[in-house]
Amino acid sequence: MKKLILSIFLCCGLTTNIMAQNENEPFKGYYYNDEYNIYLKIDLHSDGLIVPEHEIFGKLPGYLGKKYNSFYWLITTKDIKNKKKAIVEFINDYGSEDLEASLSKKEDGTIILKQLNGSDLKVPNNGKWQKIPKEITLKKK
């Protein structure tokens, strides 16, 4: 009986801890957009993400990638304004284009990526460059 009660308290404590982490780190996770087959992997609260097959860049706060492709837009700088908004700067993995964007966290857990200044966000698609809209919604996975 004591083990059962202890187990229940531990489970409740872990659940509360996990929920608190999500509230304290709103700009962390994996977000995707099925229409353009792109995803955003971010941890703006630390510089701890390694871009697959691009380890030479070291640890970064995040990156935007395309499914089934090794092309990336790397997040080089971040500025968390509050729990619902952050400003980030991207550079493509060739270093030839860069842009500034805002990330807005919505109540349903989605993120709105809005391009502010700089180059257009483009990703490879069937041998051509596909422009991503200036504002796009990414769902949390």
Regions found by a protein language model. Give the residues of each.
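Bacterial Sec-dependent N-terminal signal peptides
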Residues: M1-E23
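Basic side chains
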Residues: K2-K3, N17, K105, K131-K134, ...
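Central antiparallel beta-sheet cores of small beta-barrel/beta-sandwich binding domains
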Residues: N22-E100, D120-K141
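Extended Gly/Ser/Thr-rich low-complexity repeat segments
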Residues: D98-G109
